[in-house]
Design a protein with these regions (language model features):
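Conserved catalytic-core segment of NTP-binding enzymes
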Residues: 100-209
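N-terminal phosphate/diphosphate-binding loop that engages ATP/GTP or pyrophosphate donors
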Residues: 25-79
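Switch II (G3) loop of P-loop NTPases
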Residues: 64-69, 89-105
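Conserved small/polar residues in nucleotide/adenosyl-binding loops
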Residues: 217-224
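Conserved lysine of the Walker
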Residues: 15
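The conserved Walker
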Residues: 11
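Hydrophobic anchor at the beta1->P-loop junction of P-loop NTPases
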Residues: 7
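Hydrophobic positions on the alpha1 helix immediately C-terminal to the Walker A/P-loop
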Residues: 18, 22
Length: 225
């Protein structure tokens, strides 16, 4: 059965780096993989070396079209529909957490609804070191806005708390402490805890409650985006 992951998050959450990691892990398992960049503000893959790396791994990349040079002229390509009609093993969506990004995702609401039960994960990538996601109330407000504009229910949160090159194991632990509160208050579980191996090992050595932890190692250099 095709597995679809939608990664949504505000600027600085690290969602684009995670989308890349998930796609590369799927491809490494021999899965037919498609990565769809629906971030209409930060064109992470189209304008960076990341795009070339994706193609080298035989991952199909779909990015926004540029009608001309201005960012305001971005448009969604027809190829987005291939996520739903072609026979992929794994599809990863990288979606901006602002109103524009979430609304773009909402255009495909019925396509997501028509997916087989259990095949879709909608994951809010959270970095509590970013000002817009630093408290329970702010995260709750962000998630409500994402769900309203995308017309999809968030199925899980990803603790991706980091300070880029200044990250320590404390970032993941602080994210864990806050997101367990968010999970208890909202009913949205913590689906993944992500970071470099050294930080994950230190984090797990502190024996966090397994209910709020599922660890995933970054396979490429962590950058907040």
């Amino acid at each position: 059965m095709k597995k679809v992951k939608v990664l949504i998050g505000n600027y600085g959450s690290g969602k684009s780096e995670l989308a890349l990691n998930f796609a590369m892990q799927s491809a490494a398992r021999g899965e037919r993989t498609e990565l769809i960049d629906l971030d209409m503000v930060n064109t992470y893959f189209r304008l960076t070396e990341r795009g070339k790396m994706v193609e080298q791994k035989e991952i199909r990349l779909v990015s926004p079209n540029f009608a001309c040079s201005g960012i305001e002229t971005l448009s969604l390509p027809a190829e987005v529909q291939s996520a739903f009609v072609l026979d992929w093993d794994s599809v990863i969506f990288d979606v901006g957490g602002d109103d524009v990004g979430a609304t773009a995702l909402g255009r495909y609401h019925q396509d997501f609804v028509d997916l087989p039960e259990g095949s879709l994960e909608v994951l809010n990538v959270v970095n509590i070191r970013r000002p817009l996601a630093s408290t329970l109330e702010k995260i709750h407000r962000l998630q409500e806005g994402m769900q309203a504009h995308s017309r999809l229910q968030i199925t899980g949160m990803i603790n991706n708390t980091n300070l880029a090159t200044m990250t320590t194991a404390d970032e993941l632990w602080d994210g864990y402490e806050l997101l367990r509160q968010v999970a208890d208050a909202s009913g949205i579980p913590v689906a993944y805890t992500t970071g470099k191996k050294e930080f994950l090992d230190a984090f797990l050595s502190r024996n966090p409650d397994p209910k709020y932890v599922r660890s995933e190692e970054h396979t490429s250099e962590l950058q907040s985006r």
